[in-house]
Amino acid sequence: MQDIQLDTLLSEDVTPENASQVMQALSQSLNEHNIRYYVDDAPSITDSEYDRLMQRLLKLEALYPHLIVADSPTQRVGGLALAKFDQITHLKPMLSLDNAFDEADFSAFHKRVTDKVGEVSFCCEPKLDGLAVSILYRHGVLERAATRGDGSVGEDITENVKTIKSIPLKLRGNDFPELVEVRGEAFMPKAAFEALNDRARAKDEKLFVNPRNAAAGSLRQLDSKITAARSLAFYAYALGVVEPDSHPLAKTHFEQLQQLKSWGLPVSSEIKVCAELSQVYDYYKDILTRRSDLAFEIDGVVMKVNDIDQQQRLGFVAKSPRWAIAYKFPAQEEMTLLEGVDFQVGRTGAVTPVARLKPVFVGGVTVSNATLHNANEIARLGIKVGDTVIIRRAGDVIPQIVAIVPERRPETATDIVFPHNCPVCGSLVERLEGEAVARCSGGLFCEAQRKEAIKHFASRKALDIDGMGDKVVEQLIDKELVQSPADLFKLTASMMTMLDRMGMKSATNLAAAIEAAKTTTLARFLYALGIREVGEATAANLAAHFASLDALRVATVEQLTEVEDVGAVVAQHVAHFFAQPHNLEVIDALIAAGVHWPAIEAPSAEAQPLKGQTWVLTGTLNQLNRNDAKAQLQALGAKVAGSVSKNTDCLVAGEAAGSKLAKAQELGVKVMDEDELLALLAANA
C-alpha cells in the first residue's frame, strides 16, 4: 500500500461522513506495519508511534462500532468463548512426514528420490516443535483456520489464530489466488514460554512442560482471549490448495515460500536451498549446533525436494509425501537405573518387555518406563535388571533405552527371561521363525487381546460404535458380558445398566448405536478385524480389489500381492489370518449377528475402457464438478494425476488451462475439451 503520513492518520478530523475512510486507513496502516515488523523484520515506525495509531483506532471503533472492518488489528484480542470446537474437513489431507534419525536413514531416502527423478536439490528448514495449522484465505481475507487433527478432519480454531499477531488477517498486494490455503506451524517462542511459566509460578498454578504443549494448549482454548494473551507465533512452510489452479505459482518450494512472504506471511529466515548432499549434512549440523540459540524449539530439520515438478512425480504414500523427510535431532539423554521388567500383551498378542526405570527427567518429561521391544533388542543391549542405562526420547516422543553402562553393573544384576506362558491368560508364548516378536497363542481367549481387539473393533475408524469407549469395553469384559466382538451385538440396554455410571437412557442410546453399527462397509469391517499391518488404506484397497469377503477369505498370497500397496509381508499376514479357524469362527459369528454391508460391484474389463491410462484435469469445468469428473474417470479405470508428464495419456483442458495445457502440447499429449469429456462419459455411462 502507499504509505500514509503518520501525522495525517493521527490528526485528521473525523466526522460521521469520513469515519469509515479514516478507520480503514488506520487498519491498513497498522496491518502493514505488523507485516513489516513480523515478516520483513524492517519496522518503519517506533513502538510508541504504533501504539498511538492503535489507540486512535480503538477510540474510533468505540464511537463507530458498526464501522469496524473484519481485518482490523483490534480484532486480535479475542471474542466470545466457544462451547466446543467445530470440525473442519481439510480440502486435501494434511499428511505427516517420515523420519530420518541418522545419515543412513537420510541416505536411503535420498537414494529412493534420486532413483525415481534423478538429481535433486533440497529446500531445508528447521522442524518447528509446535502445532500444524491450515489457514484459508479467500480473496485475500482470512476465512478460516484449522488444526491438523487426524490429517483429514481438524478443529476450527479460526478465532484463536486471528489473535496471532504475525498472521495477516488480509494478504498484502493483489497477486494472490482467489483461494489460497497456507500451511504452517504455530508455536510459542522460548521467551514467551518462560514468561508464561513465570506468571503461572507466581500464581501457584500448574506449569507447562514444554513450549509445544503450551502452544497446543493455547490454540485449543475455547476462549480466544486466553489465546491472545499467550504470545504465539507462526511460520508458513507450504502452500496447500490453490484455486484456480491455473494461477501462476513459483516452480520451486523455496520460491513459493518467498511468494507467501510477499503476501505478508511470516517464513523462517533459516531456510536454505542445498544442491549437494554434503550441503544438506552441513545444514543439519549447523542448525543442530545453533539449536539452543534459536528463539524457538525445534526437534530436527525438514528436507523437501525443491523442484515442484519433481515433487509431483514422486507423489505420496498413504500418510506422507515421498519428496520430504524430517531429519530428527538426537534426543536428549540421561542415565538411570533399570529396576525391573514387566511383560505386556498387546492387541495382536505381541508380548513386549517394558523396562521399569527409576524416574528420570529427560526431554522435557519425567520418564519411568521404556519399551525394550523384543528379545533381540535385549540381547543386542546385553541388558540386565539392575543395570545403569542411558535413556533417550527417540524423536523426542518415545522413551528408549539406547545403551547400558557396563562399569556400573552390580553383582546382583539378573538376566531378563521371557515368560513361557502369557502373563495374562497363561497360554503358551510362541516366537515364530524369522520374527523378533514373541506372541501369546491365546488369540481372542486372552483377556489382554480381547480388550484391545474389541476396543479396536468398536473404534471410530472401524465399526464406529458411538459411546463404546475404552472404559465401557473394559467393564463389559470384566463383568463377563462380552468375550468376543460378536457378543457386542447380543447386548441389551438392560444388560448394560450393570455398568458403572450407565443409566437406562445412556444404555438405550448405546444399544441403538450398536444396532446401527451392524450396517457398515467391507473396508471398515476388514479394518475392524485387526489384521496385522492392515490399516485403513490397505483395508480399502482389499475391499475394492476382491469386492466380497468370500473372495478375500480364500485368496492366496500371490493373489493378495496383486492388490495396490500390498506387499509380500502384508499378504502373508492376511493369508495367515484367514487360515486360522478361530478367526473364521469370529467372522461367522459376526455375520450371524447381523453385521452386513452393501455389495461391491467388481468393475468388468468392458466397464473400464481407460484402465492403465493416466489422465490430468486442468482449468475450469463449467458443466461438471471437478471431483465428479475425477470420480467418473476413475470408475472407467483411469488414474487421475495432478501434473502432466510424458506418461500422461490425455489432458482435459477447461477454461484458463494455463501451464499444464502448454506442457501437454509440448509433449504431444492428447488434449480433450469439456464437451469431448462429457461425450466420452455419456458413451460409457
Curated annotation (Swiss-Prot):
Swiss-Prot/TrEMBL keywords: DNA damage, DNA repair, DNA replication, Ligase, Magnesium, Manganese, Metal-binding, NAD, Zinc
GO molecular function, one term: DNA ligase (NAD+) activity
EC number(s) reported in the record: 6.5.1.2
Residues bound to Zn(2+): 422, 425, 440, 446
CDD domains listed in its UniProt record: BRCT_DNA_ligase_like, LIGANc
GO CC, any one term: cytosol
Active site: 127 (n6-amp-lysine intermediate)
Residues annotated to bind NAD(+): 47-51, 96-97, 125, 148, 185, 304, 328
PANTHER family according to UniProt: CHROMOSOME TRANSMISSION FIDELITY FACTOR 18 (PTHR23389), DNA LIGASE (PTHR23389:SF9)
HAMAP family with a match to the protein in the record: DNA_ligase_A (MF_01588)
Name by which UniProt lists this protein: DNA ligase
Organism annotation: Shewanella baltica (strain OS223)
Gene assigned in the entry: ligA
